[in-house]
Amino acid sequence: MRKVVAVAFILLTVLAACSSDPRRLLSQAEAKWREGKYEDAIRLNNLVYNRERGGADGAVALLNIGNIYYLNLRRLKDAIDTYNKLVDEYRGSAEEGKARQQLAAIYLNEVGDLTQAISEYDRILELPGVQNRQEIEFLRAKAYFQKGEYNMALQALRHLEEEGVTGHLADQVSLKIGNIYQIQKKYEQALSCFQKVMDSPCIDCRRRAHLHLMETYEALFDFEKAIAAIRSLDASPENQAVISREIARLNERQREVEAGRMPRLPEGRHP
């Protein structure tokens, strides 16, 4: 009888240990998250955090909670508080970098605090072993651009070019540098930036390059090349409507210029 009781006690102990295993709890929390049971997911992640405070699983749990608040429940203050708790308690962890990226996105896209977003990107770049360093540098440059600090943005973007950025990110860097040159009215330099992206495999980048090229030639009053740039857009129903509309507008503008009427050229009409 004593042996039976002892075996039963051992089994109960093992089961209790399994049920409270942090990895198991994190899996259960993830399942609740996928099911849309967000409060249950938060409760389970909090359980892991409270049991594993200071450990790697605790950091994962806090990041999960912050993401649920931010991405699903849209409780931005709770998300910010949770991410800040994570970066305070888990400095140097992989989760700190992820939390700071989310904080930067909230400040940039939700709160409109560009200064704080840039500060978060700076802190990320100070972390050792950042995997997506060039992407973070580009996001920081975009924040400088949105803030109107074009020289800072240009400096950061040129640094990326010097590092030898490639692929889709290279296209984005060239487009953004070209936008800055447009704003600075350095149109010849802007042209070379947009021409680099004309044959990009990215449909959206290619489209933006054609539109910005058209704008730049228009600013130089070279309407023939502006029309050629817009005509060379990829064939699609959406683009065809844009092509027809822009050609009509360019022809009208050319007539106005030739007649001595010089309406102000709108800047940055295409994102």
Go through the PLM ranges and name each one.
Residues R2-V7, V14-P271:
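Acidic, polar-rich low-complexity tracts and alpha-helical solenoid repeat scaffolds
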